[in-house]
Amino acid sequence: MKLAIAMEVLSLLLMYILISPMVAMPIYSKIIFHPIPENDDLGDQIINMQTYFHCHFRNITFKALNGESMHGWYFERPSTNKVILVSHGNAGCMEHRLPLLPLLLQTGCSVFMYDYEGFGSSTGSPSMAKICDDATAAFDYVTQKLHVKPENVIVYGESIGCGAASTLSTRRKVGAIILQSPFTSFPQVAADRLVLMRLYPEFVFPEPTLNNLAIMKKEHAPLLLIHGMKDDMLPYRYSERIMAEAMEPKTLVLLPNAGHTDVYKTDVNLSIPALNKFIHCLK
């Protein structure tokens, strides 16, 4: 009987270890990320965007920190020195963020959008560590190859991309931070969505844990939080907590009718003025 109990305890302990984030993160990465190859002909839409916003479009290939090939789009508005660097969410690819571009270009800023490793035309495979490194590589390209001053780069994170944008802000000097539909930290989201994850203390989650809350509780660039109040994937209480505990300067804009994936086109009467005011108040 004692041997049977001991074997059962040992089996449970082994299972606990094997499915822990520290050991099984490669498996969890396949669950978290849902990249889609780039396959649509977007020529007409891009031409229309260039014409309407009087901007120049560049299709860009650059290197990730680990040498993989990354793909980006640069919409340059000659009349500005500010660039919004977009780190998108966990699914699709940047062509699925075309609806976001008018929202950002109307601010008067240039926009640089890119695909993480494994997304769109970018080679490799994604992980939480890699998306942070990819954000860093994109920032370095913008500042070193496009010759944009670091203080003129506004980092924009969408969903899981908020973690990449926030982490980037700890590695490089940035001009401002915009987090759309953020979360407090990956361990917190995991615990909220999977009861099993509540058994694991935060230290067993490998770095980076995409801890937006911890990063914003320290000194940071001007911060704008945007969140849909009907978001059923990442509830807006995450943004409220970040807002409550973050250091100044900080601003929170809640969109009453927006969910998780329609922030670009819902309640734009609130999001557009908020974006414009935030960006135009930057030095």
Task: Give each language-model segment a name.
Residues V9-T61:
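An N-terminal hydrophobic leader/cap segment in hydrolases
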